[in-house]
Amino acid sequence: MGFDPEKWALSFYGVVDERFAVETELLNLHIYRKEEIKTIKAERRLGKLDVFIPKDWDMETYHNQEKLRKLMLAEIKWQALNIYQQRTNLIAKRIGLPNIKVSVSTRAAANGRCFYLENRIDYNPWTICYPKIKYVDYLICHELAHFYVHNHPERFWCKAEQIYLGLDNSDSYTSEIIRKIDAEHRLSYTIFLLKCWGRPVYLKDFFDSGLVRDKTPLITPYYEDTSEGKVQIGYYTSFEIRFR
């Protein structure tokens, strides 16, 4: 079976419509249908993004899905750039580093990358959709630690933990806390899905190479643990890939 571009949206990442939402400690993103508009538009402020689509728009077509994806990706990049600029330089100033240049790019293989010779950190914009602020701050501290240690030996993890905890005494920390947070943030399946949705060409590569046997689009409720138990706070679009 060949690749059918007209069924791209349905086959690979489901239909993104008003059921799609991101509600985290750093970002609230919602999609609404609106009668008095003829094309999609966005209203934003830092930490909040509302996307409006015409009431009669057919969201199952390739053209409309790609148009929505392009707008949302641009808006997510704006949010990420501003959030990371603020938080990165706040932490960098605390540890005595000069102003760090911040950029964002949709590289699906990485959440962030330190270019220490350029005094720059590049972040994947979808990482601002982590459910908790501590994962974003961990990522910042991880990349800032690379200004001191370029690879990942034990002293790198100790440095990252020192930055994350704000400690001055080198005898006051180990790497246990930071390694635990690193393991937690890597389990955020939602971020992987969003990055693939932002760059579906990677899924097409899986399909064209014959690795994918079946695809099932899913609209999945997103829950968060509270003092009252699990509470549904939104949905995310995902997919299930079964390999040969």
Language-model features: locations:
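Active-site-proximal or metal-binding-adjacent scaffold patches in catalytic folds
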Residues: 1-138, 147-244
